[in-house]
Amino acid sequence: MKILRRFWVCVSILIFSLTVQAQSLPNESLKEQKVYTSLKEALQNPEQVYRLKLKLPRKCDSIPEEVFQLTNLQELRLTGCHLNVINRNIGKLKLLRFLHLNRNNLVRLPEEFTQLTQLVLLDISRNPLMELPESMGNMKSLEIIDAWDTQLFVLPESIAQLAETLKVIDLRQVPLKDSEHVAMQQLLPKTSIPYSYYCDCNNDR
């Protein structure tokens, strides 16, 4: 009986430990965490890695699979990394809150991307991105989308589910028609959607 009781105590401690480990850090605590810039170093203690900033070689056009072992990761910066695609495994980073993918070569994001339900900030600026995943409405924590200098002409209808939480979509330097901007604002009446590039492109789309 004592052995059984001891067993369940150990199980309870383990479950509690995993639960605590899987919780998001408050912003102030997150800022105090080390920013890892070496994937090799990060993989030595993957459960202790909350912030990662990488520069990737040109021959690497997608996120290294090892990154998805960092399941406590909450901030990921992959600025100017020559990325052409985002791996479907991106959905494994369940605690990710801040994601910087600016200055890459991304045209679209996989549907698995919308499994990042804790994401608060998404920076996809300066990519030739033309669309967002259809199920963007699943990303209930999303507050800011920086899509400056992209080709994002339309938004998925499901994004209307974020009308109460999404604060800003930056579409400056996106060749929008006025009618396209109006359609976006109707989907998200409480969201600020700045844009600064008018395009008289009726013949193009």
Segment roles from a protein language model:
Residues 1-2, 93:
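General helical secondary-structure elements
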Residues 2-7, 13, 18-79, 84-88, ...:
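The feature captures the LRR N-terminal capping module
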Residues 35-36, 152-155:
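Short hydrophobic/aromatic-rich motifs at helix boundaries and adjacent loops
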Residues 43, 66-69, 89-92, 106, ...:
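Hydrophobic anchor residues at the C-terminal helix/turn of individual leucine-rich repeat
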Residues 55-57, 79-80, 102-103, 112, ...:
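Per-repeat beta-strand-to-loop junction in leucine-rich repeat
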Residues 58-61, 82-84, 105-108, 128-131, ...:
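Canonical position 11/12 of the leucine-rich repeat
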Residues 73-76, 90, 96-101, 106-109, ...:
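Hydrophobic packing within well-folded, soluble alpha/beta domains
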Residues 75, 90-92, 107, 126, ...:
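Low-complexity, compositionally biased segments
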